[in-house]
Design a protein with these regions (language model features):
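Short sequence/structural segments immediately N-terminal
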Residues: 5, 19-322
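Positively charged n-region of N-terminal signal peptides that target proteins for export
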Residues: 1-7
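Bacterial N-terminal signal peptides
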Residues: 9-19
Length: 322
């Protein structure tokens, strides 16, 4: 990588000199057989496309420096599998013959006429394995996203694969998640400690494109202690963490969708609470809504809301108390 970086610096230098020294050099160039500039076999394209393309970026907000591809994994000359220009853009015979007056076979920009399937097929010819196995039936695949909706292959830094910048790429299309993740209680994505892809495989066909087959399995990859096994399970917890938590962010601490007692009273009775006795406040009626207004409410007593292991007292053990 370093070597190709230096190579490009030299190359740019050479071009600058070539420009200044004018026609004499241009004549020499014509005589010489074009050499590969970045990748083995790329001379068919780099005889015309060289670092001078960089001065006129074609994509409004990405500025692909065409030759910067030499500094990416796609520029590793030592690797026999490395693509050349034609592996992605096609042989483009017509384009070459007409000296750029017709389009290359595969053009990745949205304005280009190449259908999405053909653009993606160019990448998938080498990358259909691993994470991408489910691409065609993934939500993104079915929505006709192209690989280059997210990836910038010519840029030295591919924003979507860097922790600090990935979310920006997603937010271009996912405004609602931008809003959620910047709420007071959130997973540390904007802080750069984790990324959207910590939970999502955006090439995959799992539900909600999660990295695992279910929400719970995804959460357990980091919050193992919530998996149990517990002696007493709380049914909504084993069912779906998302019943109580909004994984991106909320205004309520602990990413909760609502505060106790309201959170609990979605399912548990508003107007009765058993064993209303000495330990419990003296309420006019045996009402959980009365209990809920006491201090921190339900969670003051039902502390092990994700599941309890207590075997001390069979009457309280199943109630997620210590
Ligand atoms: C004989 C010169 C020549 C050769 C050889 C050549 N091109 Fe081009 N190419 C051009 C010109 C001229 C343009 C139009 C100006 C521009 O957009 O930079 C162009 C434009 C392009 C574009 C942008 C098209 C658009 O509409 O945005 C791509 C992509 C491209 N060429 C890829 C390639 C590839 C890949 C090869 C090798 C297979 C290749 N070119 C070989 C001259 C050439
Ligand atoms: C790994 C696949 C791949 C390889 C290899 C590749 N390109 Fe590209 N090229 C793309 C994609 C994708 C874009 C769209 C912009 C981006 O993602 O950076 C693009 C954009 C371009 C553009 C700008 C026009 C546009 O559509 O935005 C030119 C010119 C170009 N490539 C020429 C080349 C040349 C010359 C080579 C060989 C040195 C080459 N490409 C190698 C995938 C590739
Ligand atoms: C001719 C084969 C080939 C084609 C076509 C190809 N790639 Fe690659 N790609 C590779 C190789 C080889 C590597 C480096 C080894 C690896 O990571 O597996 C790579 C690596 C990558 C990486 C990871 C880079 C890293 O730093 O780890 C991404 C992302 C990628 N390619 C995206 C694309 C996209 C998007 C396209 C289409 C525009 C594309 N590739 C087309 C062969 C190809
Ligand atoms: C919605 C945005 C998005 C789209 C669309 C997308 N990718 Fe990715 N890609 C990512 C992100 C994020 C990563 C890094 C995290 C990961 O590996 O899941 C990545 C990683 C990769 C890697 C390197 C990871 C590895 O396994 O080594 C390759 C290769 C790749 N993508 C190829 C593709 C191809 C091919 C397509 C089109 C079929 C595509 N991507 C479409 C966002 C995207
Ligand atoms: C070019 C636009 C675009 C970009 C960029 C993009 N997405 Fe999407 N994404 C979509 C569309 C379109 C859908 C389907 C409709 C919807 O749910 O909004 C979708 C759906 C999703 C879904 C829901 C999946 C499901 O099965 O319901 C997730 C999760 C997702 N995207 C994550 C991401 C992540 C993470 C990134 C960044 C790495 C990203 N997206 C980048 C367009 C995009
Ligand atoms: C902590 C794990 C986690 C992180 C980090 C995360 N997500 Fe999600 N995301 C989920 C889960 C779980 C769901 C499914 C929620 C559900 O079932 O309603 C989801 C759903 C989605 C959906 C579909 C929403 C819908 O209503 O169908 C989109 C789009 C999405 N996420 C985008 C993103 C983006 C963009 C990022 C990064 C800014 C991101 N996610 C980060 C876990 C996560
Ligand atoms: C990639 C690792 C990872 C995954 C996967 C993950 N989390 Fe987290 N989670 C974290 C980190 C890191 C924190 C922040 C801890 C801190 O700030 O001390 C956190 C914090 C939390 C918090 C406490 C927030 C607060 O305000 O302190 C809750 C609740 C939570 N996660 C729920 C979930 C749920 C539900 C899922 C599954 C949808 C999930 N997490 C998936 C890493 C992860
Ligand atoms: C019945 C609602 C509910 C469900 C379902 C639920 N949680 Fe929670 N979770 C809570 C409440 C309430 C808190 C706050 C606890 C407190 O304040 O003592 C919390 C706090 C957390 C915390 C941060 C504090 C801690 O205990 O580490 C994490 C992490 C967490 N939950 C993960 C999960 C995971 C993972 C799942 C799915 C396996 C899940 N939760 C399912 C209600 C729920
Ligand atoms: C999505 C619905 C739902 C939510 C929200 C919910 N629970 Fe539950 N909870 C249940 C179900 C279902 C059971 C099992 C009932 C049974 O076994 O009779 C249960 C059981 C319990 C039990 C044990 C009951 C017993 O008979 O052993 C307690 C205590 C409890 N929940 C407290 C809470 C608290 C406190 C909250 C709020 C933080 C809460 N629950 C939120 C559905 C929910
Ligand atoms: C002051 C402590 C305390 C508070 C506050 C409290 N509980 Fe309880 N809860 C208990 C005890 C103790 C039991 C076991 C009583 C028994 O089995 O006789 C119990 C039992 C339960 C049960 C099991 C009901 C059954 O039929 O067996 C549920 C459900 C429950 N509580 C939900 C809640 C909810 C929801 C809240 C908040 C609105 C709440 N509790 C607030 C102490 C408390």
């Amino acid at each position: 990588m370093k070597r190709s970086g230096r190579f490009i610096t030299l190359l740019i230098g050479a071009i600058v000199i070539a420009c200044f020294s004018g026609r004499a050099l241009a004549a020499d160039d014509k005589a010489a057989k074009p050499a590969d500039l970045v990748l083995t076999g790329d001379a068919v394209c780099t005889s015309c496309h060289d670092a001078s393309d960089d001065a006129t970026p074609t994509l409004a907000n990405r500025h692909p420096s065409v030759m910067a591809i030499g500094k990416t994994r796609h520029g590793t000359r030592a690797d026999g599998r490395t693509p050349s220009c034609t592996s992605c853009h096609g042989e483009s015979d017509q384009h070459r013959k007409t000296r750029g007056n017709t389009k290359p076979d595969v053009l990745f920009s949205k304005q280009g006429a190449t259908p999405v399937e053909a653009r993606n097929a160019a990448c998938l010819s080498c990358h259909k394995e691993g994470n991408r196995i489910g691409w065609h039936t993934s939500t993104h695949g079915l929505q006709d996203l192209s690989c280059s909706s997210c990836h910038s292959v010519h840029a030295q830094r591919d924003k979507v694969r860097e922790k600090q910048t990935q979310a920006e790429v997603c937010f271009a299309c996912h405004k609602e998640q931008r809003n959620q993740i910047s709420k007071a209680s959130h997973h540390p994505v904007v802080e750069g400690k984790m990324t959207c892809s910590s939970c999502h495989n955006v090439h995959g066909d799992n539900p909600k494109m999660l990295v695992k087959a279910s929400t719970n399995e995804t959460c357990f990859t980091c919050h193992m202690e919530k998996r149990g096994p517990f002696v007493h399970n709380h049914q909504p917890v084993t069912e779906d963490c998302g019943i109580c938590h909004q994984p991106h962010g909320t205004t309520i601490p602990n990413l909760l969708k609502a505060r106790a007692p309201f959170l609990c009273q979605d399912c548990h009775s508003h107007d009765s609470h058993p064993g209303q006795a000495a330990a419990l406040p003296n309420a006019p009626s045996n009402s959980t809504s009365m209990l809920g207004t006491v201090a921190r409410g339900c969670l003051n007593c039902h502390t092990n809301i994700h599941g309890g292991n207590s075997t001390v007292n069979s009457a309280t053990a199943g109630r997620f108390r210590r």
